[in-house]
Structures are given as C-alpha cells and as structure tokens.
C-alpha cells in the first residue's frame, strides 16, 4: 500500500484509509437507536456460536465505480472462503429478524484502501492500478468479529468498539 501511495502521491484527492481503521464490513446498519444495541449484541453473539475461525487471503485489487470515474480502491480475495459467505448470510438473517433492511448490492468482500474524490491524471491512475501485481498482500486469520460504532469526521471515520466476539 505504501508503494501505491507513493506512486499516486500527486493525487491529492485520494483519502487513504488509516491502517488502524482497515476492516471488512459484513453489514452496515447506519443510524441505530441506542436501545437496539443490547438486542443486536445478544442476537449476533448467539449466531456466532455456530461459526469457527478461518483465514482470508487478500490477493487482488479492484475499484468500485468505473475505470473512468473510480470511487474506491480496494483489496479483495480471488478465492473468498465459504466461511465468510456463510458468516455474512447469517449476519444478514440476524438483522432481518431485528427489522433492518438488506443492502441492494451483492456482498463484495474487501478492505478499502482509499476513497477517490477526484483524479488529476486518470490515465496514469489506470496504468498504475492496472499494473498492480496480483499476489498475496495480507493473510488474515479471523478469530473475532467486532461490532463497531462509527462517527464521520472531516478527517475520516472514527470507530468505537461496542462488542468483540471471539469465534
């Protein structure tokens, strides 16, 4: 990621994610009343009793948006573990039961590297991103799931851990 940041340093309108904030989102629930949190924690905890730890291998890059108007640069997996898809589906089922709507988009497991507001040199960006070697960048054992509360700030999102569940 540091090499990519150096190559794209002239692009001042890319907001790079702080390495401490890198995460994979299973379900974004948006504004949530405080009184819903205990029930969410209880239901997610019960659901996670059916899951075991697994490993994710982040070995490919991609963008959301189009080649001509990219919005997000991300790191994903060529072979997503079935355990992650099962975990995501069970998570959605919990939130269905609690009355939360599902996203309209399909689940694309990824970690966001940077959010792109605007590019000065689109062709150069396409060349750099198109030339990124597809190799194992991060191998991550998944031993816990964290329920975060996020706060949007001008400098980026700030995350507060509400509950950490071991699996």
What function would you assign to each model-found segment?
Residues 1-167:
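Histidine-dependent nucleotide/RNA phosphoesterase domain, centered on the 2H-phosphoesterase fold
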